[in-house]
Swiss-Prot record:
Motif mapping: 'KMSKS' region: 227-231
Binding of L-glutamate, residues: 8-12, 44, 171, 189
Catalytic activity, EC: 6.1.1.-
Family in the record: Belongs to the class-I aminoacyl-tRNA synthetase family. GluQ subfamily.
The record's free-text note on cofactor binding: Binds 1 zinc ion per subunit.
Short sequence motif 'HIGH' region: positions: 11-21
BP terms from Gene Ontology: glutamyl-tRNA aminoacylation; tRNA modification
Protein name as it appears in the record: Glutamyl-Q tRNA(Asp) synthetase
InterPro entries: Glu-Q_tRNA(Asp)_Synthase (IPR022380), Glu/Gln-tRNA-synth (IPR000924), Glu/Gln-tRNA-synth_Ib_cat-dom (IPR020058), GluQ/Sye (IPR049940), Rossmann-like_a/b/a_fold (IPR014729)
Gene Ontology CC: cytosol
Amino acid sequence: MTSSYVGRFAPTPSGYLHFGSLVAAVASYLDARAVGGRWLVRMEDLDPPREVPGAQRAILETLERYGFEWDGAVERQSERFPAYASVIEQLLRSGLAYACTCSRKQLEDFAGIYPGFCRDAGHARDDAAIRLRVPELEYRFVDRVQGEVCQHLGREVGDFVIQRRDGLYAYQLAVVLDDAWQGITDIVRGADLLDSTPRQLYLQELLGLSQPRYLHVPLIVQPDGHKLGKSYRSPPLPAEQAAVPLTRALRALGQRPPAELAEGSAGEALAWGVAHWDATRIPRRATLPEESL
């Protein structure tokens, strides 16, 4: 069976894969393979200062060890900078973006919502971030797990950064351009990115790009409430007995794997997942405590 479905897993090489990463990878992989779709891997290496040496290689080796097979070559955002620059120039020329010289200290009292200080200031681009003007509109979409999501861009976000002051490109711009370039039809990722999606919908609309379907899976959190992640030194996935964490990941996604699946191979665990995948079983919640799995 084949389909037009194109999914992707897009890790950031600021550390190694951990259990939270695995849950997102399993969800995106099974959602694609269950319908005969393609599954791509993309390195989101936008921020060289934060990249851990050797992490890209380690991530790919872990995916292979855990039985994942991707289609085509691994793409890297660091090779796409000219495409991002071209779109930023286009947005600046059309007046849809502008230079912003605000410091973090100037903005610290605004709870992450940009107040528009530089919107009409006409600053030069030197030593400035680039922000995208947002409309006073509410954006809605229906997530396949989390249901309807609404966000008023003007009131809840404000004009947002698409290129940082240090010249590095922002995630919101890069992810939209790369998903369109790769023909991604379905985005399956962690629920921490749920509130980024309306910004991405706006960019897609602005640039005339097609809108993919979205599915946001619960984040795995530690007892203190922090999500599993590189910032909190979550342990990397074990090199051996990959079927054990794979089976736990299936349970985190609401699937019902037999206990003996953990005693087999990684390939067997993923094959079971593909054959029995049911996205409607994924818990409709933003987080899941790791100790409950």
